[in-house]
Amino acid sequence: MADSLIQSPDLGDVTGYLRDRIRTVPDWPMPGVQFRDITPLLQNPKTLRVLIDVFVHRYMDAQLDLVAGIDARGFILGAIVAYELNLGFVPIRKKGKLPFQTVAEEYELEYGSATVEIHADACKPGDRVLLIDDLIATGGTMMAGRKLLERLGATVVEGAAIVDLPELGGSKLLQNAGLPLFTVCRFDGH
């Protein structure tokens, strides 16, 4: 269940508006995959404003301290949302991309494993953090990001994304692990 301070906007027509502008690229990056491309949402200023406003209105009264974004499209969304909410932004990067002392978390992918890192001083104990990415597929990256933030003493108030691909099991995994999750729209299949 979501934090009582988080207000869920009435997404009715907004969800359809945004969903209709997400491009589906068949057979990319491999045959059988339906890639959900959010770049059309970012390219149109009106659409980008609508998208960001969904997140801003949801979290404006959530008493957050930081927004953390997952490499790479979570950086785009997270930084803009943080700016609009007058909060700091924390990048969660792929291994080897941060210059200072880091904390790392390995997670499993369909085809192996990967590692994400965060600066060791990225947040303080007790910080309330929104964790944001573009899409929830298997949930591994967001779960790893949550673990990093919690290892530094932060509380991840909610995970957020534009797209949920529920058939890949990520949203269920995250919710079963106790992470409240907000997504703007969902697509069946993968």
Curated annotation (Swiss-Prot):
Pathway: Purine metabolism; AMP biosynthesis via salvage pathway; AMP from adenine: step 1/1. The keyword Membrane does not apply. Its EC number is 2.4.2.7. It is found in: Cytoplasm. Gene3D superfamilies: 3.40.50.2020. NCBIfam families: apt (TIGR01090), PRK02304.1-3 (NF002634), PRK02304.1-5 (NF002636). Belongs to the purine/pyrimidine phosphoribosyltransferase family. HAMAP family: Aden_phosphoribosyltr. This is Adenine phosphoribosyltransferase. It comes from Cupriavidus pinatubonensis (strain JMP 134 / LMG 1197) (Cupriavidus necator (strain JMP 134)). The gene is apt.
